[in-house]
From Swiss-Prot:
Alphabetized NCBIfam families for the sequence: IpaC_SipC
InterPro entries per the UniProt record, alphabetical: BipC/SctB
Protein's UniProt name: Effector protein BipC
Record field: compositional bias (Basic and acidic residues): 71-91, 380-392
Note, other: Human meliodoisis patients have detectable antibody response to BipC. However, BipC does not act as a protective antigen.
GO cellular component, one term: extracellular region
Secreted listed as a keyword: yes
Organism: Burkholderia pseudomallei (strain K96243)
UniProt-listed Pfam families: IpaC_SipC
Keywords assigned by UniProt, alphabetized: Secreted, Virulence
Family statement drawn from the similarity comment of this UniProt entry: Belongs to the SctB/SipC family.
Length: 419
């Protein structure tokens, strides 16, 4: 088996390649043999040195003969680069999946290790330049002693992937912090709305208690005034109307006596006198003329003198009754005013309570709107984070596709080298 370098005329046998690979193994022993990565690095460096020597000799020979000189570029360790690219992209993909699933920025160990290992491009470039200088003389020893570096550390695409991962972590941290703040805002708005509900209920209860107490007090006061009015009317009937009625009856009887109507008729026993009870309670005895049909002038004169006094007393009873009715009317009016005032006071309390409830409901609406706004902002933020994770996943998929394409190209180049 041999490896051919196109356009150079150089053939390297399998035995010679094995000798070059084994040249740097004496100091490392079995441990270096088991280290596949380091063995591949030494083999690539040795291959580069041999190709360089053969190309230099060929170039000198061609220059001496006057033919056109062909220069070959130094081959890159494609196998190691492709393998490390695959591992790197796979690691980024796993880290991205864990980060998207857990939504916590603490799952970043692998990414931080990659950043610390590969982000220092200056050191990698310096080591790479030093390795190129020593490749022609002491390539195996230089490859063994140099620190393990990856050729893709100089690749801008890989740096972009690292920057994308760091930005994604920072974005996740910012998303979590913002979602926490928005969630707290929504929680505070919900608690404030609940407090407004309690305030509205307390205002309604206070208004109901105050209005009920005021209305009960005024209703009781009005009822007491109405009872006084009824009592005044009852007293006036008892003390004024009844005596007035009795006086009117007595006055009418006396008037009939004066006119000779219903005067006493003498029976066969011929009673000689009649007793008349005055309004003062005094009983007066009058003699009856047995032969006449009219009272004596003396008796008529006595009855006529007492009539005006009786009429005056009748009129005074009527006037006092009217005064009592007026007093009862005032008491009735006070009762009605008290009841009306209680209703008005209750309406005022209800109005003040309704105003307070309206203000509380307005604040409640504001809190509910703030809660809805915070929830909408949180949802929008979460959707933006989801889109960011999708974009990162697409970038990783693109990197995987690029690695796959590089592998395909490398396989094709290797196939061409074998032919």
């Amino acid at each position: 088996m041999s490896i051919g370098v196109q356009s150079s005329g150089i053939n390297i046998s399998h035995a010679e390649l094995s000798r070059l690979v084994d040249a740097g193994k004496s100091e490392q022993g079995d441990k270096a043999v088991r280290d596949d990565g380091r063995a591949l690095a030494r083999a690539d460096a040795a291959l580069a040195a041999v190709v360089g020597e053969r190309v230099a000799a060929r170039r000198d020979a061609v220059a001496g003969s006057g033919a056109q000189r062909v220069e070959l570029a130094r081959p890159k360790p494609d196998a190691q680069t492709r393998a490390t690219d695959r591992r790197t992209v796979s690691g980024l993909e796993r880290e991205h999946k864990r980060l998207a699933a857990s939504q916590t920025p603490r799952v970043t160990g692998m990414h931080d290790a990659l950043v610390q290992r590969h982000v220092s491009l200056d050191g990698a470039k310096a080591a790479h330049g030093e390795g190129v200088k020593r490749a022609a003389g002491d390539a195996p020893r230089a490859a063994a002693d140099a620190p393990q570096r990856f050729a893709f550390a100089d690749d801008k695409a890989f740096d972009a992937m690292l920057a994308l991962g760091a930005a994604m972590q920072k974005n996740v941290q910012s998303d979590l912090a913002m979602q926490g703040k928005l969630t707290m805002l929504a929680h505070d708005a919900m608690m404030s709305a609940a407090a407004q509900d309690r305030s509205i209920g307390a205002a309604q209860m206070t208004a109901a208690i105050a209005g009920g107490a005021l209305q009960a007090t005024t209703s009781l006061g009005g009822a007491m005034q109405q009872m006084k009015s009824l009592s005044t009317k009852s007293m006036s009937i008892e003390k004024e109307l009844k005596p007035q009625a009795e006086l009117k009856q007595f006055h009418a009887e006396q008037a009939l006596e004066l006119r000779g109507i219903n005067k006493p008729v003498l029976s066969n026993d011929e009673v000689s006198h009649v007793k008349i009870k005055r309004d003062t309670g005094e009983t007066v005895r009058h003699e009856i003329d047995h032969g006449g049909e009219r009272m004596s002038d003396e008796h008529a004169s006595v009855l006529a003198q007492e009539a005006p006094a009786r009429q005056h007393r009748i009129d005074m009873h009527g006037m006092r009754h009217e005064e009592n009715l007026v007093k009862a009317g005032r008491q009735q009016m006070k009762g009605d005013l008290l009841q009306s005032g209680g209703q008005i006071g209750k309406n005022q309390i209800d109005g003040a309570s309704a105003q307070q409830q309206g203000a509380d409901r307005a604040e409640q609406k504001e809190d509910e709107n703030a809660q809805q706004t915070a929830m909408a902002a949180a949802s929008t933020r979460d959707e933006a984070a989801h889109r960011s994770r999708e974009a990162a996943q697409k970038a990783i998929d693109a990197a995987k596709s690029q690695v796959a394409n590089d592998n395909a190209v490398a396989a094709q180049v290797a196939g061409n080298l074998r032919t």
